[in-house]
Amino acid sequence: MSEIHSIMITNRQGKTLSVQINGPENAPAIVFSNSLGTDHGMWQPQVAALKSQYRVVTYDTRGHGQSDVIENTTLQNLGEDVLDILDALNIEKAHFCGISMGGLTALWLGIYQAARFYSITVANSAAKIWTEDGWNARAEAVEANGLADLVASTHTRWFSDKFDYKNDNLAQKTIQSLADTPAQGYANACRALAKADVREKLASISIPTLIIAGSADPVTTITDGEFMQQHIQCNQFEVIDASHLSNIEQPEKFIQIFSGFVKSIQ
């Protein structure tokens, strides 16, 4: 199977998750996890570059894209959804790459489910993102007023001033995916992030870990990346000249770093 294949899988809570599979069925598997307020489409450059050599799996995080909105979401739920996807696809072990919220998911998997993964990549993320009060306030604001205000300003958080996001097709599609995200799904994810804090657990990660930070990222900073580098035993730390969605702003550089890391493990 080399062409894209889209399926809906049922997770352990009986809810559906939208999953896309590219690449040869017997090739090593890579799973990509999207950021808050986006969907699987944000990984298009990486999928295109890697699908000839790997079984590339993308999915819409619960409450995003075509996946079900699920109440009372936690970081553990986000991690267990990944395990349910692997089980549904009969993938015993995979490389996992997550950005922002997906990066926190990667950390949880590296801490609690390392046997299922060759490696984790934590891009533009942190062991604790922002503040509990900030996330809860944003969840309440989105529930009350929708996502329009966030959509209007998100380019200032996602992309650097040097990046012409208005004329970048994927950047525009990704901003539209935020507009299309169910408000309740977004709010539920905010509340999961409010409680997500794995700072005290980082030292237990023993599988190969790639940490990617954006030099102009105002959300998850180089300092956040350095903190993870200092506390995770087996890691590689890279900085990309980009803001928060480094895989969109600098897709070739992201692919170069990530593919080199994955190849070094095989």
From Swiss-Prot:
SUPFAM superfamilies: alpha/beta-Hydrolases (SSF53474). It comes from Acinetobacter baylyi (strain ATCC 33305 / BD413 / ADP1). GO terms for biological process: beta-ketoadipate pathway. Its EC number is 3.1.1.24. Residues 28-250 form the AB hydrolase-1 domain. GO terms for cellular component: membrane. InterPro entries: AB_hydrolase_1 (IPR000073), AB_hydrolase_fold (IPR029058), AB_hydrolase_sf (IPR050266), PcaD/CatD (IPR026968). It catalyses: (4,5-dihydro-5-oxofuran-2-yl)-acetate + H2O = 3-oxoadipate + H(+). Pfam families: Abhydrolase_1. The keyword Hydrolase applies. GO terms for molecular function: 3-oxoadipate enol-lactonase activity. It comes from the Bacteria. NCBIfam families: protocat_pcaD. This species can form two 3-oxoadipate enol-lactonases in response to different inducers. The one shown is called enol-lactone hydrolase I by the authors. Pathway: Aromatic compound metabolism; beta-ketoadipate pathway; 3-oxoadipate from 5-oxo-4,5-dihydro-2-furylacetate: step 1/1. It is an enzyme of class 3 (hydrolase). This is 3-oxoadipate enol-lactonase 1. Keywords: Aromatic hydrocarbons catabolism, Hydrolase. PANTHER family: HYDROLASE, PUTATIVE (AFU_ORTHOLOGUE AFUA_2G14860)-RELATED (PTHR43798:SF33), MONOACYLGLYCEROL LIPASE (PTHR43798).
